[in-house]
């Protein structure tokens, strides 16, 4: 089952578009501000549609304090982590980060070129025991063991708003099915 934690204002829209999704309403109407019952879920993704409200930073911090299983982290969750670097050390090992180049630069520091960014992503994944899926024309998948895989089968149609959110959902679905993380990377 899919459960989506959303602010109250989004319930009608979500239920209309995806009636099969279970809804866990946030205590706030307009933004993510709380974490409840999080340990009940087999896999968790955070970021798409999250926003950057100060309450969301606190809620993300709460999430990172209680969750021990790997997370899929994307979009505004990456931006919140970039703005609050102390959250980096709280990300559970084997989590999967899915930044585009600018999001990654916000977390790891500006890169002068793609090669430097790739080397940083590889070191970052190893140092933090994470997987970094660095999205782009040739998506690079950097694993915690230092391996780097490339996916060159993208197309210009994927360079549009929302396609990264779809990738996050696909990775989350694979985690929820219990697929071994090393297979998800490829």
Role assignments for model-derived ranges:
Residues 1-75, 79-96, 101-184:
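Small-residue (G/A/S/T)-rich helix-start motifs and N-terminal tracts that mark the onset
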